From Swiss-Prot:
Naturally occurring in which organism (per UniProt): Danio rerio
Subunit text: Component of the endosomal sorting complex required for transport II (ESCRT-II), composed of SNF8, VPS36 and 2 copies of VPS25.
Functional note: Component of the ESCRT-II complex (endosomal sorting complex required for transport II), which is required for multivesicular body (MVB) formation and sorting of endosomal cargo proteins into MVBs. The MVB pathway mediates delivery of transmembrane proteins into the lumen of the lysosome for degradation. The ESCRT-II complex is probably involved in the recruitment of the ESCRT-III complex.
GO cellular component, one term: ESCRT II complex
Protein name as catalogued: Vacuolar protein-sorting-associated protein 25
Lineage of the organism: Eukaryota, Metazoa, Chordata, Craniata, Vertebrata
Length: 174
């Protein structure tokens, strides 16, 4: 399945941050939506700012336009404010991208556990994210850091407990 680009993607001014405040807000909202949709489609969880400039999401070769590194930083900062991005370093060169927040992943995981009658069951993190039983689930292949945060959110809600096992971490659902 190929990614469907929004109409703005082929509109050259989209690749230049607009000076008008209202226009810029709409533009940033569109960029945030595009970045999250693209990362979701490609199942990307980490981004490098310099590499991002060359990626298709910020570089439309068809119209020969790309967003500047400074503008990418502005988009990323907007995503951070919304809770969809976390910087991995002080230089703000690499980040975690959360096209779905940990609480949302936790909810999806718990729905699957409940739907399949697996409450009071124990899983290894590997089984949960990479097991045969979860192959058709959206959380299949979820990176460990996000899986752990999702389970921590469930633990906070009293729906799960993260446990340490001989071969790593596991989780019990309630």
């Amino acid at each position: 399945m190929s990614f469907e680009w929004p109409w703005q993607y082929n509109f050259p001014p989209f690749f230049t941050l607009q000076p008008n405040v209202d226009t810029r807000q709409k533009q940033l909202a569109a960029w945030c939506s595009l970045v999250l949709s693209y990362c979701r489609h490609r199942k990307l969880y980490t981004l490098d700012v310099l590499e991002a400039q060359e990626s298709p999401v910020f570089n439309n070769k068809k119209i020969e336009r790309k967003l500047s590194v400074e503008a990418i930083q502005v988009v990323f900062e907007e995503l951070r404010k919304k809770g969809n991005l976390e910087w991995l370093d002080k230089n703000k060169s690499r980040c975690l991208i959360m096209w779905r927040r940990p609480e949302e992943w936790g909810k999806l995981i718990y729905q699957w556990v409940s739907k399949n009658g697996m409450v009071n069951s124990v899983f290894t993190l590997y089984e949960l994210a990479n097991g045969d039983d979860t192959e058709k689930e959206e959380f299949h292949g979820l990176e460990d850091w996000m899986l752990l945060r999702s389970l921590q959110a469930l633990q906070t809600d009293g729906k799960a407990e993260i446990i340490t096992m001989d071969d790593g971490k596991g989780v019990k659902f309630f």
